[in-house]
Each structure stands twice: as structure tokens, then as C-alpha cells.
Amino acid sequence: RVSMPVKPKQMPISLDNMLESFHNIDVNAFPEMRNYKRFYDDMNDFIDKIVPIPSVKNYTLRFLSKCLSGENRDEGFYIWTGTGGNGKSKLIDLMSMCMGDYSCNLPIALLTQKRKASGAASPEMAVTKGKRLAVMQEPDVNETLNVGQMKEITGNDKISARGLYKEPFEFTPQFKLICMCNDL
């Protein structure tokens, strides 16, 4: 049994919200890790190759760790840019694999097209409920981002969503939104 320094009702977010996708995680998949040191060294080597500048590496790791919290205090839209083949996607693939159902991919059209009519189905947004990390790929050259839509998604306010043939519901997004770009 674990003792917590604060009571669950005093926490800024409900423990139930933090653990809503826990049923999809196999906690017995790795009962013991015999080669932890090797794993740790391999992970550090991998991240050092992708993010060789120490200050940028620290920022990146801090950002990725913030994805786990389910809080969006920063209200940010993050653009990861750089030449193709520099490891951006591999790092996101690793993070997505680690986060399982807590991560998702979103179409960039969510930010490049006009807002949908009120009450229209929005399955892209409905799927983000409870997610901690959402990733988009770069827009086409002539596309512009709908800043109002971006603010709505990342602004830490409740949004309304509706899956196909479902009733609308409101929720506060918990995810960090990353757009992966080779060019800006």
C-alpha cells in the first residue's frame, strides 16, 4: 500500500482521470529487468544521437515527461522541426509506444481547415479525450494554420466533441500537441 503526501481530493486532477487507460497496460510484461544498466545506457545513447545539445536534450526530456501528467498548464503548440532522418519520428514512436493508449495521431487538417459547424461530428477530437500526447505531421506548403482552432485545442478550456453517430460531450484536453515538420 502506498501513502500519498496529499489527499486525493486535494490533487489538481482526479486519480481516476490519470488512470483511465490503465486497463490496457500489462503490468506483468516486464516483471524484472536484468539488464537495466544496459537499457539505460542504450536509451541515453539513442537520445544523445537525436538531441546532442545538452540544454535541448534536457528541455526535450522535461517536455516529454510533462506529457505524462495530464495537465496542460503551458497551453502550447509545439513544432518539432529539422531535416528528415534526424530522429524526430523515432523519438515520437518510442514515446507513443511507451504511452500506449495515452497517445494518438491527429490529422493536420484539424488545424488547416475551417472549423466544423457546431454539433457536427468531430471524431478526431473525440478520440483525444484522456490522451496525453497528440502528434500531427507537417502541413502542405500552401496551407496555413487556423490559429483560433489551435488556441481552442491547446487553451486548457473545455471543448465539445462528438464521435460519429454519438452524443456530444465536453472535456478539458490533457494532451500536449506536437507538429512534426521537416520545413517551416
Q: Which residues fall in each region the model found?
A:
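P-loop NTPase catalytic core of nucleic-acid-dependent motor ATPases
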Residues: 2-130
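A Trp-anchored, charged/polar loop motif used as the substrate-binding/catalytic surface
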Residues: 49, 156-160, 180
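Short beta-strand segments
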Residues: 65, 79-82, 135-136, 178-181
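AAA+/SF3 P-loop NTPase mechanochemical coupling elements
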Residues: 123-129, 162-180
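Conserved AAA+/SF3 P-loop NTPase catalytic/coupling segment centered on the Walker-B
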Residues: 130-154, 169
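Conserved nucleotide-binding/hydrolysis micro-motifs of P-loop NTPases
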Residues: 140-141, 182-184
